[in-house]
UniProtKB/Swiss-Prot annotation:
Spans through the membrane: 29-49, 68-88, 104-124
Quaternary organization: Forms part of complex II containing four subunits: a 70 kDa flavoprotein (FP), a 27 kDa iron-sulfur protein (IP), a cytochrome B and a membrane-anchoring protein.
Protein name: Succinate dehydrogenase cytochrome b560 subunit
Subcellular location, record wording: Mitochondrion inner membrane
Role: Membrane-anchoring subunit of succinate dehydrogenase (SDH) that is involved in complex II of the mitochondrial electron transport chain and is responsible for transferring electrons from succinate to ubiquinone (coenzyme Q).
Encoding gene, per UniProt annotation: SDH3
CC cofactor: heme
Length: 125
């Protein structure tokens, strides 16, 4: 009566990956990552008062902050820029602008180029 060999989620296996769906998923992941990266330092500071091990990790991080802080800023900046520019693209889609396949591919490439160029000008030049 029941077919044991059927896939659990056939909708994930029968379709090819599309660029628009991939960027939409990364938009959601970038929002969660941005929230986690911004909310975790105050929570870690609060938890460091309860545990000696957490306090030692915090002390190590603060003593090496000249190495950690620039990379932390770069990572948050890249995630923030991607999320904001992709959010603008989603607003354009909601207003039915650039919803055909050629425009979506062009907008995806433009999105990546903008994030790369802005980060290049911000941190290197």
């Amino acid at each position: 009566m029941y077919n044991i060999n059927r896939p659990i989620s056939p909708h994930l296996t029968i379709y090819n990956t599309q660029k628009s769906s991939l960027f939409s998923i990364w938009h959601r992941i970038s929002g969660v990552a941005m929230f986690t990266l911004i909310a975790s330092p105050p929570l870690f500071l609060k938890l460091a008062t309860f545990s000696y091990k957490s306090f030692n990790i915090l002390d190590l991080m603060l003593n090496n902050s000249s190495l950690i802080l620039p990379w932390f800023i770069v990572i948050i900046s890249v995630i923030f820029l991607y999320h904001i520019i992709n959010g603008i693209r989603h607003f354009l889609w909601d207003s039915v602008v650039n919803v055909n396949t050629e425009s979506i591919i062009k907008d995806s490439n433009t999105l990546l180029a903008l994030v790369f160029l802005i980060m290049l000008f911000k941190f290197i030049l």
